[in-house]
Structures are given as C-alpha cells and as structure tokens.
C-alpha cells in the first residue's frame, strides 16, 4: 500500500486518519494542503512527514512562480512558505531536516537559475532523492536491528505508536526490524500498544502488520506492564521523532512509560531511527519542544464525547525518554550503544564524511 506518491503537479497521500476502516487518499495540489495534511495527521511519522514536506516545496515553488513579481521576490515567498511548513509539527526534527536540506540546495544553486520553473525542477529531483533514500535506509536499519537478535528465535516484540511503513517512505523503522525478524523466521509475535489518544497502534500498527500476515496482538497502553510481568515480552522496539547528542529520545506520548517498565523488568529497550532524526544542536531532551495538541483528542473518541464538558486536559503529543533507559539505537549505519555522546558523535563523522 503506497502512502506517499508524487504524480505530476500533485502529491497523493494515504489519509491515515481514516484507517483501518477506510482506504482514502488526499490529493494535494497546493502546499497549504500538504501543511494541513501534516498538521491533521493525515500523513504522520517523522520520516514520512519529512518526505511529504519536501514534495510540498515543489507545490510552494509552483505557487511562487505564479506570482507576477521579480524572481527574487518569488524566492522570498518560497522561503516564507518553507518556514510555515516547518512549523506544522515542531517536535519531529525530520520535517525541519528535509525542508532545510531542500532550501539549502536551492540557495546554493540560485545564482545559476533565473526562473521558479528551474527551482521547481531542482526541488523535484531532490524530493525524489529524499524519498528514495528513506526506502534504502529503512532496509539498512532493518538489517542492522536484526543483528541484535542473532541466534534467537520465537521473539516477542512490544512496540508503541506506529513506526512502520505508514510512518516512512519504506519498510518502517521499528517495524522494519520486525519485518526482517519475521522474514528470518525468528519472530513469534508483536504486541502493539493501542497508543492513546489517537490510537496509532490500534489503527495503524495492528493494521499494517495484520495486512502483511505478521502475528500481532493488540493491547491497551495500561496493559504493557502486565504483558512484561507475565513474561510475554522479549524486547521493546520503538521509533523516534528527535534524538539529542546525549541519546535522549522524543517519541509518541507514552514511550517514556514503556521504557521505565522495560528497565524494571530487565527487558531491552531499542530505538530505531535514521540519521535525519538526530538533532545535533541539542544535548538534553529537556530542550526538545513538545507539541501540545487539541483537547478534543482526549475528550472524545471518533466523534463521541467521552469526558465531561469544561474539564482541563493535558495532551502532549510526545514525551522524552532519557538515554539511561535506552539499550541501543538502531540506525542505517549500524547499532549505537552507550556511551551515546561518543557513538552518536562517531555516527555524525561517518555520515558527514560521505
């Protein structure tokens, strides 16, 4: 099932808010539609929104081209549009990474161009490269993650939220590893937290694993402790939306609680994320901006009110797991282990030397 596809002048996105009961697509012909799709979680997952935003910049360049102003002013409009795209989801660093990468490329080549048509062509090529890279690095992450389970069979994995094909341009980050273990005949079952309040685990993770014939058991978030206590979980694998230079990990709300439970039960807690998820400007997770979402996501479920009117609501979209709780970080360049400041620093050297 394709979740992101660029067709001439149109970005086609699988509307993940309709899953699992309806397969519907959003056709974006304007960059604002892309921004709205990201904000409203029609497309979600840190790598996926980075890919979507890079395609959205093509539409932004096309709109700027329609402005009857000098080329320099059209470029200014494009840069302004790009900043708006970046602001749609402040926690997921992949979004800003993709937008900044594309805009930096435009600025590096702008002196050799004289029209927004040329700019749009350049952005199109780069967006396609970003998408293709995501597919490739998902495979490499899956292979790297599988090395953590060499010689083991009947493996039972717990995951939180959705870090699968629906969250990326490829196999997925956490679920890419799961798929590799399944392919190797090592996987017994995946336990998927439903992931309140928007049920990404129930609606998306359980959906895509079931569609692929991978054994999956759905549990409510407050059942994770029970599953661990009963010896049903061998390892936890989650994705990430931002990782600091210390190895602190921002991911979907509830991830921190799962990590604490895993530590208490001596269960390894793995994070799978590409290089683009690392924020080298931040050392501590306390500095990661946490997106706060609307109250109705907590007080209603599928349009049905589940709480009294007028109550206070706390609805952070993410929490931060301290690096001390992370057993290893799985990347496309291999597995990182503590000391994370050293291993993440080496990762940066490897990638930037290419």
Task: Give names to the regions the model predicted.
Residues 14, 52, 96-98, 158-162, ...:
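Short beta-strand segments
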Residues 26-42, 76, 147-151, 155-159, ...:
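Short, hydrophobic/aliphatic alpha-helical segments
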Residues 27, 31-34, 46, 50, ...:
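Generic structural signal for well-ordered, non-membrane alpha-helical segments
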Residues 40-56, 89, 95, 162-170, ...:
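Conserved phosphate/anionic-ligand binding catalytic regions in large, soluble enzymes, centered on
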Residues 94-156, 186-188, 192-236:
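Ligand-binding beta-strand-loop-alpha-helix segment within the catalytic cores
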Residues 172-183, 259:
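Histidine-anchored nucleotide/phosphate-binding helix
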Residues 195-354:
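Conserved phosphate- and dinucleotide-binding cores of soluble alpha/beta proteins
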């Amino acid at each position: 099932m394709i979740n992101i596809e660029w067709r001439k002048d149109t970005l086609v996105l699988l509307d993940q808010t309709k899953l699992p009961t309806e397969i519907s697509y959003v056709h974006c012909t304007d960059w604002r539609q892309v921004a709205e799709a990201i904000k409203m979680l029609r497309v979600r997952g840190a790598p996926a929104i980075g890919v979507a935003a890079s395609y959205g910049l093509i539409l932004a360049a096309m709109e700027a081209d329609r402005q009857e102003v000098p080329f320099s002013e059209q470029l200014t409009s494009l840069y302004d549009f790009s900043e708006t795209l970046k602001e749609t989801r402040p926690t997921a660093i992949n979004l800003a990474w993709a937008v900044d990468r594309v805009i930096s490329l435009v600025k590096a080549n702008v002196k050799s161009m004289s029209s927004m048509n040329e700019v749009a062509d350049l952005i199109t090529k780069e967006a396609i490269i970003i998408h293709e890279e995501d597919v490739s690095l998902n495979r490499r992450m899956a292979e790297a993650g599988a090395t953590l389970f060499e010689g083991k069979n009947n493996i039972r994995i717990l995951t939180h939220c959705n870090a699968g094909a629906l969250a990326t341009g490829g196999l997925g980050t956490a679920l890419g590893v799961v798929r590799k273990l399944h392919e190797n005949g090592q996987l017994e079952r995946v336990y998927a937290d439903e992931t309140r309040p928007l049920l990404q685990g129930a609606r998306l993770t359980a959906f895509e694993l079931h569609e692929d014939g991978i054994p999956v058991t759905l549990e409510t978030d407050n059942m994770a402790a029970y599953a661990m206590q009963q010896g049903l979980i061998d390892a936890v694998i989650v994705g990430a939306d931002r990782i600091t230079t210390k190895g602190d990990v921002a991911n979907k709300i509830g991830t921190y609680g799962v990590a604490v439970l895993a530590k208490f039960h001596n269960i390894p807690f793995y994070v799978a994320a590409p290089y683009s998820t690392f924020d080298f400007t931040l050392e501590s997770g306390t500095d990661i901006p946490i997106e706060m979402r609307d109250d109705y996501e907590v007080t209603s479920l599928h349009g049905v009110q589940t709480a009294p009117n007028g109550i206070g609501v706390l609805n952070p979209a993410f929490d931060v797991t301290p690096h001390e709780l992370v057993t290893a970080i799985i990347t496309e360049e291999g597995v990182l282990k503590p000391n994370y400041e050293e291993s993440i620093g080496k990762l940066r050297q490897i990638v930037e030397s290419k």
